[in-house]
Amino acid sequence: MSLDPVKKLVILAKSNIMQSNNMDALEAIRIKFLGKKGYLNQHIKNLNDTSLDIKPKLGAAINQAKEDIYTLLIERKNILQSKNIKNTLITDTLDVTLPGRLSDIGTHHPITSTIKRMKIFFNTLGFSVIHGPEIEDDYFNFDALNIPKYHPSRDEHDTFWFDEKRLLRTHTSGVQIRAMINKTPPIRIISFGRVYRKDYDQHHTPMFHQMEGLIVDSNVNFSYLKKILYDFLYNFFETDIILRFRPSYFPFTEPSAEIDVMKKQETGNWLELLGCGMVHPKILHHVDIDTEKFSGFAFGIGIERLTMLQYNIDDIRVFFKNDLQFLDQFK
């Protein structure tokens, strides 16, 4: 067998490769010449029938032919890929007059935004943020707050009880008791958290958020309490509102009051907003604070109620439905 057939095979392969116009055709040529059943492998199989004097030269020629054909395939592949890229750039031109694609940008939930604003305000007044457990015992949730055994808030139809002693807290006031036990006056703290009550309607949900504040010091009085709350509410709503203090009753404060709010454009429509009062002396005695030296005041605000008033929302349940159409309004 002479070397001529191998040389002719390389020439044929080169001609086929140069005429190929796509990657599929190029792959077919590779298989045709370099595949297991390709032309060059057939020549390799025929080496055994070749005379010994020409066999080494023929083997070397076949290997060189493989390299040459492989190089031609790679070069043609690169050319075809470049053509494909150019064609894509020509056909897929960008119309700069089209509107851009807007990406969805996350934002704070309205409840989270309200909490953030409240923290900023009270931090400027020197309040520290503290936290407490959501699973409470009856002492911190009721007894230490001067709430008697017969109080309706202890009933099973109002409160989520685990057993006779443990419950889901109905307010964050237990955090204040722990603060007064673990700290010495002056005390100036606020707490935020989830609380639980067995209510579900347009204005109540089984879980909601509450913020409570507490100051215990030697020069604490009711007028200072009123000033702090008025300053906060005027700062929060950033609009014309009318506030009124009215007397109320809470077992843990004496005297007690509630604040109602009315927007000036909604004359006559008072809305209950928060409760407050001077810390009851019995509570200070429970935590070994000398009532001859110190007094305190506390206040509690429903965060959902505050947010509803801010954004004119009339149903508290929408906060917990994960309705994107509703939540997108607060971006």
From Swiss-Prot:
Catalytic activity field: tRNA(Phe) + L-phenylalanine + ATP = L-phenylalanyl-tRNA(Phe) + AMP + diphosphate + H(+)
Cofactor note: Binds 2 magnesium ions per tetramer.
Main location: cytoplasm
Domain of life assignment: Bacteria
A Gene Ontology molecular function term of the record: phenylalanine-tRNA ligase activity
Binding-site residues, Mg(2+): E254
Compartment(s): Cytoplasm
InterPro entries: aa-tRNA-synth_II, aa-tRNA-synth_II/BPL/LPL, Phe-tRNA-synth_IIc_asu, Phe-tRNA_ligase_II_N, Phe_tRNA_ligase_alpha1_bac, Phenylalanyl-tRNA_Synthase, tRNA-bd_arm
ATP-binding is among the record's keywords: yes
Keywords: Aminoacyl-tRNA synthetase, ATP-binding, Cytoplasm, Ligase, Magnesium, Metal-binding, Nucleotide-binding, Protein biosynthesis
Cofactor section: Mg(2+)
NCBIfam families registered for this protein in UniProt: pheS (TIGR00468)
HAMAP family according to UniProt: Phe_tRNA_synth_alpha1
Record family assignment: Belongs to the class-II aminoacyl-tRNA synthetase family. Phe-tRNA synthetase alpha subunit type 1 subfamily.
Assembly information from the UniProt record: Tetramer of two alpha and two beta subunits.
Protein name (database record): Phenylalanine--tRNA ligase alpha subunit
Gene that this polypeptide is encoded by: pheS
